[in-house]
């Protein structure tokens, strides 16, 4: 069974048994529930919903199902076709729509797809809204409108160029400074929608572009998650081409990974750190936000600029809520997700790229030189599998009590901040697992801290 239902939408492998995988009836059921939620929030209004997708092989099929279902529910549709996740989010706002559905499984393998659900601000649904959709999906007896109430497709126009124009128009994107540096950039778009937008954005910034996996066929050339073990190809190409840097995006282009001129990883955590350094240089004393599992380096850089750092629960919707609460000038997640409120409240690899290249141009440094200006931390990510009979919440409470004298945050699992390192323990919502994230000044220290807490969990569980 691979159909995973959550407050942000549903995802699963395409085909197989209904209610156990992502099948046509499941797509129809959850799209109908979403349309009902939006109608409930807008009584008596003729709804308009934006639909966009990444380049997955199943994308067009799922998009057709979503579009047809929305029309059957009486909603009008603006279909932006092949579009990035941030682009679809921005289209909702630009087109003044009532919501949006993004068809993408992000960094998951090619057999997966998903529906991500947006509100009228082009942001992910709140926890309460997501739960309402899940509840509505299980209700029976919904009556669809008659033939005169069917919606219409208002347009089928790409939004990618508009997205690029809006990024380049930002006051802190210094197009001329980047053009003067004439960066040579290798870009790996894993044969998804990034292959359409990233080369064009880079060329508009005056870069010489070497394209790698930029044909949007949906046949991912490697594991689509932008982790170091999946990026050996671009590292080799950078060295061979004597490029200044490499840019890697995931299939829906909300995550940005950077590779230095020597083929070494800039490290995803430091995408946000570097962009924040630039934004804070223009907004001294500004606040920042990332999630609890993100690097301490962002806090260090924020405090260097006289600002205040805040942490949210994991998940884009939680980061955005905390950013709005604190008035943060920049934020995001440590997986390369940059959220710049001056454009929109969503992770966006295009704005991340433009702001990063501006900073690199202003600094007059190489990638490795810039990376060396930031505090160096090492992260270890582990998990411990438990039996279904074990009360995971009770285990986490025990850990929290043991370390009550330390700086403990329990808004999302349990995070313990020590003077030189930290550990974050999170339970899975779909399986009996505790994820163990640690960060320290060396890899050996991070690994040792993880093993220490894995040992404590085993002791508590008597395993």
Regions found by a protein language model. Name each.
Residues 1-68, 72-73, 153-185:
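An N-terminal, well-structured beta->alpha segment
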Residues 245, 281-463:
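Phosphate-binding and adjacent anionic-ligand microenvironments
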Residues 13, 113-241:
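Gly/Ser/Thr-enriched, mixed-charge loops and adjacent short helices
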Residues 36, 48-112, 200-259:
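N-terminal small/polar loop signature for handling phosphorylated ligands or for N-terminal nucleophile
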Residues 51-53, 187-189, 260, 342, ...:
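Short glycine-centered, acidic/aromatic-flanked micro-motifs in structured strand/loop junctions
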């Amino acid at each position: 069974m691979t159909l995973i239902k959550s407050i942000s939408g549903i995802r699963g492998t395409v085909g197989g048994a209904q209610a156990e995988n992502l099948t046509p009836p499941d797509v129809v059921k959850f799209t109908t529930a979403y349309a009902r939620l939006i109608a409930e929030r807008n009584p008596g209004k003729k709804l308009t919903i934006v639909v966009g997708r990444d380049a997955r092989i199943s994308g067009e099929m799922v998009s057709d199902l979503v579009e047809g279902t929305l029309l059957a529910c009486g909603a009008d549709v603006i279909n932006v076709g092949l579009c990035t996740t941030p682009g679809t989010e921005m289209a909702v706002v630009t087109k003044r729509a009532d919501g949006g559905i993004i068809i993408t499984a992000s960094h998951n393998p090619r057999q997966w797809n998903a529906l991500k659900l947006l509100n009228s601000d082009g942001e992910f649904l709140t926890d309460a809204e997501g739960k309402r959709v899940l509840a509505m999906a299980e209700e029976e007896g919904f009556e669809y409108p008659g033939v005169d109430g069917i919606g219409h497709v208002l347009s089928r126009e790409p939004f990618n160029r508009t997205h690029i124009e809006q990024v380049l128009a930002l006051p802190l994107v210094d197009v001329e400074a980047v053009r003067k540096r004439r960066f040579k950039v290798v870009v790996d778009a894993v044969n998804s929608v990034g292959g359409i937008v990233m080369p064009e954005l880079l060329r508009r910034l005056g870069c010489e572009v070497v394209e790698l996996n930029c044909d949007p066929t949906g046949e991912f050339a490697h594991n689509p998650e932008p982790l170091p073990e999946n990026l050996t190809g671009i590292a080799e190409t950078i060295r061979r081409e004597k490029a200044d840097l490499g840019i890697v995006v995931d299939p829906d282009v909300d995550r940005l990974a950077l590779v230095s001129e020597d083929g070494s990883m800039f490290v995803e955590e430091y995408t946000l750190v570097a962009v924040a350094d630039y934004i804070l240089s223009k907004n001294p004393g500004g606040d920042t936000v990332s999630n609890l599992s993100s690097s301490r380096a962002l806090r260090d850089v924020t405090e260097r600029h006289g600002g205040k750092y805040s942490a949210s629960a994991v998940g884009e919707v939680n980061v955005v809520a905390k950013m709005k609460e604190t008035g943060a000038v920049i934020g995001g997640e440590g997986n390369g997700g940059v959220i710049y409120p001056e454009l929109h409240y969503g992770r966006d690899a295009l704005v991340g790229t433009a702001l990063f290249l501006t900073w690199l141009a202003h600094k007059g440094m190489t990638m490795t030189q810039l990376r060396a200006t930031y505090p160096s931390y090492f992260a270890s990510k582990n998990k411990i599998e438990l039996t279904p009979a074990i009360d995971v919440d009770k285990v986490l409470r025990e850990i929290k009590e043991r370390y009550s004298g330390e700086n403990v945050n329990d808004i999302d699992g349990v995070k313990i901040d020590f003077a030189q390192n930290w550990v974050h323990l999170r339970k899975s919502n779909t399986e009996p697992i505790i994820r163990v994230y640690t960060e320290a000044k060396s890899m050996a220290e991070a690994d040792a801290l993880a093993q220490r807490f894995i040992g404590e969990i085993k002791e508590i569980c008597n395993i």
